[in-house]
Amino acid sequence: MTVELFKELLFSPFGLALLALLAERWFPWPEQWHPFAVLRLMAAYMSGKVNKPDRPSSQQKIAGFLALLTMLLLVLLPAAIVFAGAEVSLAIGWLILLVSLRQQTVRQATHLSEQHLSKGRKNAARAWLTRVTWRDCDLLSEHGIAKTSIELRATSILESRFAPLLFWCLGGPLAALGVRVLAELKEVWPTAQARYRHFGQATAWLYAITHFLPSFFLSLFARTVGLFRRNTPKIEPLKRNPLFPTILLSWLQSFSYCHKVTLGGPIQAAGIRISRQRFGGRPAELLLSQAARWQRIWQVFFITCLLIGLFTLFIYRP
């Protein structure tokens, strides 16, 4: 292999994505210095200013749409200007992808929560989960803590890994950043909470559109793997829930089917109980110790896909 060919493969979309995956996994980036921390603060501040609960629902929907448009412009427009005007556009694009693949916050919080739960410290376990989810975690039982932790890990596989990688390969760094920003805003403005019931509808709608293909491909692979495992639970028709993203619910169902773990079921947000379809399997608290290993397996799967892409480029190079 010549030096020119090595550089061509290394700086290809698959090579850069592989480097970004490894960098995000092994090099720590403090949460307070990450751009998404600023994004969440800006989104929360903006919603506090323009989302007034005493206004009609139509005005709240319009305010939510304008807030979404503003946040996307504030994030994507400067990134596009820097990316287009930089002499080292590959490096800038790689940094944008690295930002979009941020998973350390959820991974560390769930890991510490699982550690505390294994030692019987339920309050500490609940506190760590509260930092990374809009759900009410104060009254969670051991089963609820375990199920929430696994669901957060599964959600991060879709939103923090596969969706940015897929959009990176299809549309470049700005597409990867855009789809990840939507996932972040969906967490800041969850329609499951009454105050964002109408304000967050535009974000939830665009999230469903952009995450349809990533959820479909991941769910298809997970269900295919589940077919070759013994004693997998039966897949029941998915029941739509207006207060929880159907796209995400479909992925959680497939994840539950693949790993034979109980997920879904009712949750609580801002004091309101929200019913969700339950997906059968073994109790989550019995399989919680394997959750980190499952996440690593999916990481290896993504790395394998990128290596296959690199090998394909090598075989079919001009």
Task: Put a short name on every predicted segment.
Residues 1-318:
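Hydrophobic N-terminal alpha-helices or hydrophobic patches in metabolic proteins across all domains
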